[in-house]
Design a protein with these regions (language model features):
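Membrane-interfacial helix-loop-helix junctions in multi-pass membrane proteins
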Residues: 412, 498, 547-602
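ABC transporter nucleotide-binding domains
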Residues: 3-210, 216, 458-459, 464-473, ...
Length: 618
């Protein structure tokens, strides 16, 4: 353990009644590649997420270079890089902007981030595409960009979770070359894979994991030797004769014939000297009148190892299939293979004291930088997505024009004397605009969760609150810009502030503050439902009646009495009335205290709730 880069002891993780990790023990030596092999659902990704501090284990202990992943998670994040199953890059940003952003979040200066980004773009053969949006990249290019994002600070340990799944052979070989180069430079790699050839090519040590526990471990050669002898491989002319061939070959060699990777193949364990067995097999097949296209000996592969350990062959695409027997348990294993038995009663490992990280001036500056970097990234999304830009700007302007020129004449009769409908409407439309756009906070966060960008942020040594602060701050800036644009349109069609510059600024500040409070509500919604569609539906169900059952478009005196009771205490009504008074009437609005109370109350409740929910994602 003294020279271990990663040490795992009795690690357990459960999701409800499902045990994803059932007492995993591992030691990964420094500057080596450790391969973790297993089928889908075996527990590989869960183990990586625990080691990357994205999940908290239920029992056991895991350390990265001596730092506990639970009690010194921030320290662990300073040492690692993570590349998940999917390329967690920002598709709206260019390749260069992605690397510069992640570099800044890794606490590099702006200049160092630019220089390091340029180095990695050259190294990963992405320089020519550096200024193209990442969404235009091929799968292999995205993977290389994702891997480059993990190497901005030259991490001591790199977790690669199925880095080549879904890639073509050329792209896969490019990733393999990068992995070998990293090891030569001294980086430790923990590689999970479904591809047996990949583990054989890259890993110095391999562990086979199934149903949440390690069932065998050793070098590739050691695992193959444990299978024993050689393999007699039979390739039939007609796949339909495979069952007849199995019957004909029964009793030949030192084991029963087993299906191969293809429907026209059979394999048999052979003794060390298998030449005589070839003759016996050929004779048996001739007697059964079964045509053979190929018959020969080969050394065992990891495919054979996996077959013997789990009782299931790899799938036809070369990936490991689900390795379970009929009773849902790991398949039979050879007596010569070291197999991990079900662990005894597992107890939580001894817990070292948590390391408290004090908020120094330097740390505070770094946290502010993190939030600013995330804010800029989100503002670039707003600018570079035309559909989002058009919806956010045109929709509220259309409301102003529609209500002013279509409904204004009828509604004007219920307004106080001397107040034009455009003067009444515009402050309300400002409130309506920030209210409807609050759901965009949830949609943006939910998309980042789905694409793995949030996991990338959470695995980095950045401020834990920066993702949420950066998102809501960007939405605040966006709201202010759209409010100003709508006021300009309002002035064109007859609106005007009547109470002076100070109150006009107060009106804008009040509406913006209300939008910020709603953004924090929807940040909490996104972290709870984790679905853009669900977040959008929740926004429609809640916000639509809240806006239309308020004084945004009409005075509440024109509403039925039962609805007036709700409308008078609605935060939308109080904010709209206060904004309207600030815009039109000198002095302190009567509803200003109620509006501010709603804003402060919502922020006081949902900022802590959102931060708590974000931290509870482990």
């Amino acid at each position: 353990m003294a020279d271990s880069a990663v040490h795992v002891e009795g690690l357990v993780k459960r999701f409800g009644t499902t045990t994803a990790l059932a007492g995993v023990d591992l030691d990964v030596q420094e500057a080596t590649v450790f391969g973790l092999l297993g089928p889908n659902g075996a527990g590989k990704t869960t183990l990586v997420r625990v080691l990357a501090t994205l999940l908290a284990p239920d029992a056991g202990r895991a350390e990265v270079f001596g730092r506990d992943v639970v009690h010194d998670a921030a320290g662990v994040r300073e040492l690692l890089g993570l590349t998940g199953q999917f390329a967690a890059v920002d598709e709206i940003l260019t390749g260069r902007e992605n690397l510069q952003m992640f570099g800044r979040l890794f606490d590099l200066s702006a200049g160092d981030a630019r220089r390091r980004a340029n180095e990695l773009l050259e190294r990963f053969d992405l320089a020519d595409a550096a200024d193209r949006p990442a969404r235009t990249y091929s799968g292999g290019m995205r993977r290389r960009l994702d891997l480059a994002s993990s190497l901005l600070t030259r991490p001591r340990v790199l977790f690669l979770d199925e880095p080549t799944t879904g890639l073509d052979p050329r792209s896969r070989n490019e990733i393999w070359s990068v992995v070998r180069e990293l090891v030569r430079e001294g980086t430790t790699l923990l590689l999970t894979t479904q591809y047996l050839e990949e583990a054989d090519q890259l890993a110095e040590q391999i562990a086979v994991i199934d149903h949440g526990r390690v069932i065998a471990q050793g070098t590739g050669s050691e695992l193959k030797d444990r299978v024993g002898g050689q393999i007699l491989e039979v390739e039939l002319v007609r796949a339909a004769e495979r069952d007849n061939a199995r019957a004909a070959l029964a009793g030949i060699g030192c084991g029963e014939p087993e299906p191969g990777e293809r429907l026209d193949q059979l394999t048999l364990p052979a003794p060390r000297d298998g030449l005589e067995m070839i003759e016996d097999a050929a004779s048996a097949l001739r007697r059964a009148e079964i045509a053979v296209s190929d018959l020969g000996l080969r050394r065992p592969t990891l495919d054979d190892v996996f077959l013997q350990l789990t009782g299931a062959p790899p799938s036809e695409n070369g990936a490991v299939g689900d390795a379970v027997t009929g009773n849902g348990q790991p398949g039979p294993t050879s007596a010569s293979v070291s197999v991990a038995r079900a662990p005894a009663t597992l107890r939580p490992a001894s817990t070292p004291p948590s390391r408290r990280r004090r908020l120094s001036p330097r740390k505070l500056r770094a946290d502010i930088t993190d939030a600013r970097v995330v804010s800029v990234r989100n503002l670039l999304h707003f600018v570079r997505q035309p559909d989002l830009l058009v919806f956010s700007t045109i929709q509220p302007i259309m409301f102003v024009l529609l209500f002013t020129y279509v409904f204004g004449g009828a509604i004007s009769q219920s307004l106080p004397r001397g107040v034009s409908y455009i003067d009444y409407l515009l402050p309300g439309i400002l409130v309506q605009s920030v209210t409807f756009r609050a759901s965009m906070t949830a949609i943006g966060l939910a998309d980042d969760l789905k694409l793995g960008v949030i996991d990338r942020f959470r695995s980095m040594p950045m401020a834990r609150s920066a993702v949420l602060v950066g998102r809501t701050a960007a939405d605040l800036v966006r709201n202010v810009l759209i409010i100003v644009l709508m006021i300009i349109v309002g002035y064109i069609i007859g609106f005007g502030f009547k109470a002076g510059v100070a109150q006009a600024i107060g009106c804008i500040a009040l509406v913006s503050g209300f939008g910020l409070a709603l953004s924090w509500i929807f940040a909490f919604v996104a972290l709870t439902v984790r679905s853009a569609e669900a977040a959008q539906s929740a926004g429609f169900v809640v916000l639509f009646p809240l806006v239309f059952a308020s004084s945004v478009f009409v005075p509440i005196s024109s509403m039925p009495s039962w609805l007036q009771t709700f409308a008078r205490v609605s935060p939308v009504t109080l904010t709209a009335n206060a904004a309207r008074s600030l815009a039109l009437v000198p002095g302190t609005p009567p509803s200003l205290g109620g509006a501010i109370a709603w804003i402060v109350g919502l922020l006081a409740v949902f900022i802590p709730l959102s931060v708590w929910r974000y931290r509870r994602m482990t």
